[in-house]
Swiss-Prot record:
It holds the Pfam family BCNT. PROSITE patterns: BCNT_C. May play a role during embryogenesis. May modulate tooth organogenesis since alterations of this protein function affect tooth organs size as well as individual cell fate and survival. In embryonic cells, blockage of the function results in increased number of apoptotic cells, reduced proliferation, alterations in cell shape and fibronection matrix synthesis. The keyword Ubl conjugation applies. Residues 1-18, 25-43 have a biased composition (Acidic residues). GO terms for biological process: cell adhesion; fibroblast apoptotic process; negative regulation of fibroblast apoptotic process; regulation of cell population proliferation; regulation of cell shape. Residues 1-153, 188-217 are annotated as: Disordered. The modification N6-methyllysine is found at residue 215. This is Craniofacial development protein 1. Residues 49-65 have a biased composition (Basic residues). The gene is Cfdp1. Residues 174-213 are annotated as: Hydrophilic. It comes from Mus musculus (Mouse). Keywords: Centromere, Chromosome, Developmental protein, Isopeptide bond, Kinetochore, Methylation, Phosphoprotein, Ubl conjugation. Residues 188-197 have a biased composition (Basic and acidic residues).
Length: 295
């Protein structure tokens, strides 16, 4: 058995180291081997060519894509630039239009203000013409207003009134200033208007012949004249008050006396205060009596 095993191992080694010679291969085997080698070489060459083509094609496509992107971006920028320029022009036109409208509004407001107040040196030319026309109309209407004002006296105007009184057989004339719209001034004006026609009637223009009827007429007219010309009598108290008022006007102490009387030492103010106190006390007592009388 051992010999058999050693022989087997030797044969296996010999088989591995055995190389057949070229003469032992047939032509068909050689042709097949050559074809297989050619096919393998072609496949490897195609693989390497395909890899190179892939490597060369990727950056070209990328470049083409980047070129397209850049062109699109440039076109977009140009479009955006054109649109932005158009928008800027539109905004400028809109700004000019708004400024013009604002200026027109300011001019109109200024003109209306000038119409209410009067013409100014810095006014617009259109407003100046309007104001000039209005001033001309006002100046043309002024004389009519003045004529009306002259016919009717104002309320603030003062009118001097002279009254004649009889004091102990003496004629006393009193002059004072009152408002033109007061009752006293109106009555005085009416009285003067009545006295004017009477004076014209009583003064004879031509001498009349003597006669009984004429004498009676003249006697009656004289009596009526005496009755109409009867003077109002003045009492002693009124005369003393009149003298005191005239003295104050001559000396110019009216304001000083008024200030003095308003103070604590003034007799008139004290008397008025005491009168108010008495009146208030009377009202309180009356209210108490009425409250007790109620059931």
């Amino acid at each position: 058995m051992e010999e058999f095993d050693s022989e087997d191992f030797s044969t296996s080694d010999e088989d591995e180291d055995y190389l057949p010679s070229g003469g032992e291969y047939s032509e068909d085997d050689v042709n097949e081997l050559v074809k297989e080698d050619e096919v393998d070489g072609e496949e490897q060459a195609e693989k390497t060519k395909g890899k190179r083509r892939k490597a060369q094609g990727i950056p070209a496509r990328k470049r083409k894509q980047s070129g397209l992107l850049l062109e699109e971006e440039e076109d977009g920028k140009e479009d955006s630039g054109g649109s932005s320029s158009e928008e800027d022009e539109e905004e400028q036109e809109g700004g000019l239009g708004s400024e013009n409208a604002r200026k027109k509004k300011e001019d109109e407001l200024w003109a209306s203000f000038l119409n209410d107040v009067g013409p100014k040196s810095k006014a617009a030319p259109g407003s100046q013409t309007k104001v000039a026309e209005e001033t001309e109309e006002i100046s043309s209407n002024k004389p009519l207003v003045k004529a009306d004002e002259l016919d009717k006296p104002r309320e603030s105007e003062k009118v001097k009134i002279t009254k004649v009184f009889d004091f102990a057989g003496e004629e006393v004339r009193v002059t004072k200033e009152v408002d033109a719209a007061s009752k006293e001034a109106k009555s005085f004006l009416k009285q003067t208007e009545r006295e004017k026609p009477q004076a014209l009637v009583t003064s004879p223009a031509t001498p009349l012949p003597a006669g009984s009827g004429i004498k009676r007429a003249s006697g009656m007219s004289s009596l009526l004249g005496k009755i109409g010309a009867k003077k109002q009598k003045m009492s002693t108290l009124e005369k003393s008050k009149l003298d005191w008022e005239s003295f104050k006007e001559e000396e110019g102490i009216g304001e000083e006396l008024a200030i003095h009387n308003r103070g604590k030492e003034g007799y008139i103010e004290r008397k008025a205060f005491l009168d108010r106190v008495d009146h208030r006390q009377f009202e309180i007592e009356r209210d108490l009596r009425l409250s007790k009388m109620k059931p």
